[in-house]
């Protein structure tokens, strides 16, 4: 028996374990279906299957794995349990974020003498996947002001800070532990995200809703929506407040940026002494590769307009101001004049002038800088536009390649510092121009009626310099001694290639005379007289005189500047002109009468009668509609006696009703013979009055006999 049992046990022992398990499961299934063939083996098998196929959410291995991935779920659970028991504290848990805050409106209970006071001052974020934290913060934060998309340094306006309290002690430490950060009473308006987030690990950080308290010496730079005052900072900063050396950011917040700073009447030495290309690093960091190597102009963020300075009735100005305030991608391009032999102070002046001095020629600064003129026409800003215009004229006007032009430039730079010879002419012409507007500017901008409305309309932007506008500073009479030095400098500036932007306004020839009368109070005649002198002096070298651009403000431009007009080589685009010829309107809408159409048809038929007589006789039965060579002619009854050569008006010979025959009812040859017989009678028609009724019942649609249609 033992020998017989060995071979039986041999193959059983040779079966692998996995196969044996499969066989046992099959037996268990068969026993369950067959009514218990092997109850002893089926019971433990059923128990094992029930344990292994439980719900996955309650599986201890899955729970452990989820807690391990969550990164210290036990510590987070302990924190959640602890703060849920505190009255007046609300704890929220979303994935891997635990938010603890005070319930708004809960009456604060008097704290125990030895108990620590808990405030909603931190949000612990641990092990957060990228991209989820910002959405959760936006979800649980109070509604904030709209922000720019795509800027990583956008500022988060803090919620109203609760009353000051001692910082809470660190509770049971989560993993990784949040480093306690110093907290102040409130974040400054220009705080960055780093003021609210404190990184504690590779993917963990602590959020401080009230912001971190930064040092008093630290200068805050913001790149997003912070406040309306810092938005107008770089364009409205005084020339006497120099910024730091390394603070050329797109958004520089001055300490107290006033919206209406008086222009500095000082000399160009009051400009901050910074290197000439100090404005270019921010440009190279913030614009696309198409303009990054470009030192010809400087790109700055456009200042926000101030709605209080715009009158309520000016709908166009307010609409434009709201467009500028809400545009997400607005910037300002300031061309820089390239002076190769100029000393460094003048190069700095060319970079710093548009923001240092507030002149009326910059449309981007009007809404924020020009005050509404009061009762007296000339406020305290009366002499500053003259200085600014003299400086701008020198900045673009001087020929940088000749020594005489440099000497002329130095002479012009000294003129604004000594304003007494210009003050009589300035006071006379600044009063009708409302203090901020000068007659030189009134010629090119008739829309300078309100100080809050920008007036620059750019039709074309060329990359060549317009030296004729640059040589004339915007001074009425005292600028005339500068004329003799102009032609020699213009001959030097004939080759193209300088990077001064030129505005080419499209104007009709008659608008210059219209501006004489419409702006008599602003006295633009000295400027135009100078233009005539300049055109006579320059001769055929220059076609027209155009004002050069100091600033170009782009409102809501492209995200990539490589698509904008600033980087295109040529500005000539295909223009479609839609015009209406007023002289041809009458002939366009004048339709010929039916009698004239009939006469034209008769002449054509007489010419073609010999050629087509045979073919038309064959087709006379079914060719009623094909007999008409003129498309507009309708087969109606014809008054042969009323057809006149000059009968474009009422046909007077409408008495021959008995002689009319419908054209389609007669053969063509007979009808033509009848028409030829009636032709001699057309010369002397009988003077019979016209009938005011339709010709016949069959001809109700033919109203040739009604004179009302022909007068």
From Swiss-Prot:
Chain positions covered by the region annotation Disordered: 134-305, 328-384, 414-438, 500-535, 572-630, 642-662, 674-711
Organism, as annotated: Homo sapiens
InterPro entries, per database record: Phostensin/Taperin_N_dom, Phostensin/Taperin_PP1-bd_dom, PPP1R18/Tprn
Comp. bias intervals (Acidic residues): 597-624
Comp. bias regions, Low complexity: 267-282
MF terms in GO: actin binding; protein phosphatase 1 binding; protein serine/threonine phosphatase inhibitor activity
Subunit: Interacts with GRXCR2; the interaction restricts TPRN to the stereocilum basal region. Interacts with actin ACTB; the interaction may stabilize stereocilia. Interacts with CLIC5. Interacts with PTPRQ. TPRN, CLIC5 and PTPQR form concentric rings at the base of stereocilia and may form a complex. Interacts with phosphatase PPP1CA; the interaction results in inhibition of PPC1A phosphatase activity. Interacts with DNA damage response proteins XRCC6/KU70, XRCC5/KU80, PARP1, TOP1 and TOP2A; these interactions recruit TPRN to sites of DNA damage where it may play a role in DNA repair.
Name the UniProt record assigns to this protein: Taperin
Role this protein plays: Essential for hearing. Required for maintenance of stereocilia on both inner and outer hair cells. Necessary for the integrity of the stereociliary rootlet. May act as an actin cytoskeleton regulator involved in the regulation of actin dynamics at the pointed end in hair cells. Forms rings at the base of stereocilia and binds actin filaments in the stereocilia which may stabilize the stereocilia. Acts as a strong inhibitor of PPP1CA phosphatase activity. Recruited to sites of DNA damage and may play a role in DNA damage repair.
Feature: compositional bias, Polar residues: 197-206, 283-296, 512-521, 581-590
